[in-house]
Amino acid sequence: LGDVYKRQVIWQVENPDEKVLYFSIGGHPAFMCPVDEKGKQSEYYFKFDTDKDLTYGLIADDGQGLLGQEEDVLPVAEDGYAQITKHLFDRDALIVENHQASVVSLCTPDKKPYLTVSFDAPLFGLWSPAGKGAPFICIEPWYGRCDRTTFDGSLEQREYGNTLQAGGVFRREYTITVE
């Protein structure tokens, strides 16, 4: 049996002001995939703590960095695995909302998990630079995200935005496990 390493990442936001603070926070941790120079990313898998297909949103292609209206589905098998295909990230990040999963693992071609990110965030992103052949994939827990292309409201009305009262503290964490 190999060693297992865990790293806990803690986000803490404090509001020292007398006014309400509106904010979003998210990570951008990147993990090697493939784990050696011989393999291809498209031979690897995600494993989720669900056997339901994941619905995800896509960044609009207008260059503004906003969430478009289009959604797609990442097929998840009954055992929780989803193939990382060659063109999965061609249209930027996969934005998975509504607590559809809280554990995401990267798995070798023989479906053995080598890295797991566990979180209680309401949404997360999966990303690797499109068309660059980058040797990594990001698994990004988020408490908030970019606005939709159709949004024209205030900070108080943002989807997945967070509110912190005067003197309040927001504390969340996620865990990275390497096997």
Where are these regions (language model features)?
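Active-site/ligand-binding surface loops and adjacent short beta/alpha elements
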Residues: 20-22, 30-119
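Asparagine-centered strand-capping/turn motif at beta-strand->loop junctions
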Residues: 11-17
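A residue-level signal for conserved active-site and pocket-lining positions in enzyme catalytic cores
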Residues: 28, 139, 167
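Short Pro-Gly-centered flexible turn/kink motifs
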Residues: 11, 162-178
